[in-house]
Amino acid sequence: MQGTTIAAIATPPGAGGIAVVRLSGAECYAVAARVFRPANPAKKVEQAKGYTALFGYFVDKEEAFDEGVALFFRAPHSYTGEDVVELSCHGGSAVARRLVEACLTAGAQPAAPGEYTRRAFLNGKLGLTQAEAVMDLIAADGRQGAALANAALGGALAKKINAQKAQLTALQAHLAAWVDFPEEDVPELDPAHLRTVLGAVREELDGLIRSYDAGAVLREGVDGAIVGRPNAGKSTLLNLLAGFDRAIVTPVAGTTRDVVEQAVQLGDIRLNLFDTAGLRETEDAIEAEGIRRSWKKLEEAGLILAVFDGSEPPSREDLALAQRCAGRPAIALVNKEDKPTRFDAELIAPYFAMVLPVCCREEGSRKVIAAAVARLLGTGSIDPHAASLSGQRQLSAALRARDAVAGALDAAAGGFGLDAVSVCVDDALDALCDLTGENASEAVIEQVFERFCVGK
């Protein structure tokens, strides 16, 4: 299906080697012919074959304002499934904007955010989970996050979900025949086979759901709070992880009075770190407000790095902090490993996932902390090439499908009859079709594509 011809800049704004203006739609070759003049007069834009390129000049009102390359794609062998022309001009906002304006004057319409990928979805070039993976791939900061998104773009999730749908569809066909046509002498489903199929599907869905949190960390990053007493080494830790002097470090207790924020790439994980004010009793109103914010960040964080001064015995504030970390995704870092140790780590160990001796001034500690964070958040064991869920929409659909399959197993075990099992299997299939986008409403499609930028 060929839609209205649209145009937009497909590359990031600002100075660069090249900028790409993408045209897609029924008249994109005609529009391109009005703004692009091949250097070889014998070459005609309208006659260009797919997967070919022409060098030439970009014109606006017959005035050549840049030179570059036009790439041609014929429907359906293009990203959108429509005729597509990509015009590569020199980078820089002025040239790219003028080229887009020339395309609009020549008959194109401005593309809406995500409209190219939306057309790819509507034309069957991508499934909904693959379309969502495009945005994940664009936003990925680490290799593993990019690999997860690329696996989904390649259809890993869609294939896994379709395999479960095939199992349930075959099961439902037998159930429906037995329930709806009792006079046809349809053999009753073997209870053991029923339990085996439903159990296998539930196990696959459980695996996807379990891996969601680790996958989300790789794709989206996590907020991390650095907490501890004054002069324990919190700001030194932030500087170590950031790779430069982000926070002021002095021997004066209470130097950090407000929350200092810094994005850090730790291995394959993006951390949004918050270095907080030192936790202690104080009568200073400004410092007290900083401490209040420290506790608030601790409660909100998806990762807690609690720093303790290993050169001193545990204080009352240390023990209070440890207790506040109980049951949270928290790592205790006993700092100043380069000094004689006076800190009894066993007193705080029950409250943390792990306790690590470190020296926040040494680069080697960064690797130790990175490995510990990966273990705690589950990213160290995730297969970046495997199917994984992305976003609340997919997770919600997977949970509904898993719960419906569990309901079918309960109905079978409780002797409620195969008609009750059939209803649950139907619900599971509906949820899986929601996940893949086969049942997606216009509102859901809008929600997916509203995250996209113009030009993608």
Question: Which sequence ranges carry the predicted segments?
Answer:
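Switch I (G2) and immediately adjacent beta-strands of P-loop GTPase domains
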Residues: 55-65, 70-74, 254-282, 300
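C-terminal-of-GTPase-core extension/linker across diverse P-loop GTPases
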Residues: 2-13, 143-265, 282-284, 313-456
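Short glycine-/small-residue-rich Rossmann-like dinucleotide-binding loops
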Residues: 242, 277-278, 302, 309, ...
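Generic enzyme active-site microenvironment
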Residues: 273, 307, 333
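A glycine-rich (often HGG/GG-containing) alpha/beta subdomain
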Residues: 1-147, 151, 155, 331
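Short, Asp-centered acidic motifs that coordinate Mg2+ and/or phosphate
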Residues: 271, 303, 331
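Inter-motif core of Ras-like GTPase G domains
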Residues: 287-311
